[in-house]
């Protein structure tokens, strides 16, 4: 468990030039939000929905990052700064970097899209500040989403998504 934490801290440190030590990374709200999410997701998967939402609520209050307990998150997610929202059916791969004020939002279930309402981010995706990725779309591996982009269609592998 300690080795996994050190690996996670190193993955964040490799993507952020600001921290001088792993100790600094331990203070990042994004790290705490992901940690609380892991607990909330476990409770959610065990059908303890109220407790899952309670942990989620506590995490949101402490970190200004809202990750629904139902969201599926891979290894080494780095949320750099707060005010990020990740919806219930969102799926995030490994080594994804999300900057501040990002929304992985859903579409209205009444629009005919059953089940999956939120985006899927594959491995090694980077999402710029203020981006809004909406609906049951896929952002493929190594894609980059520019700051303040509004993305409503699939983004191919290695592509850059900007604008509306």
PLM features per residue range, with description:
Residues 63, 68-69, 74-75, 80-82, ...:
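Left-handed beta-helix
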């Amino acid at each position: 468990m300690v080795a996994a934490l050190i690996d996670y801290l190193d993955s964040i440190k490799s993507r952020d030039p600001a921290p001088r030590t792993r100790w600094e990374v331990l203070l990042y709200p994004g790290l705490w939000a992901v940690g609380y999410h892991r607990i909330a997701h476990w409770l959610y998967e065990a059908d303890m929905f109220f407790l899952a939402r309670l942990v989620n609520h506590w995490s949101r209050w402490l970190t200004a990052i809202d990750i629904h307990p139902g969201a599926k998150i891979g290894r080494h997610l780095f949320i750099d700064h707060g005010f990020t929202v990740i919806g219930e059916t969102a799926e995030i791969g490994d080594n994804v970097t999300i900057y501040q004020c990002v929304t992985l939002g859903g579409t209205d279930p009444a629009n005919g899209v059953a089940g999956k309402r939120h985006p899927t981010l594959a491995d090694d995706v980077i999402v710029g500040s203020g981006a809004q990725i909406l609906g049951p779309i896929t952002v493929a591996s190594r894609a980059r989403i520019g700051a303040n982009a509004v993305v409503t269609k699939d983004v191919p592998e290695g592509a850059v998504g900007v604008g509306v």
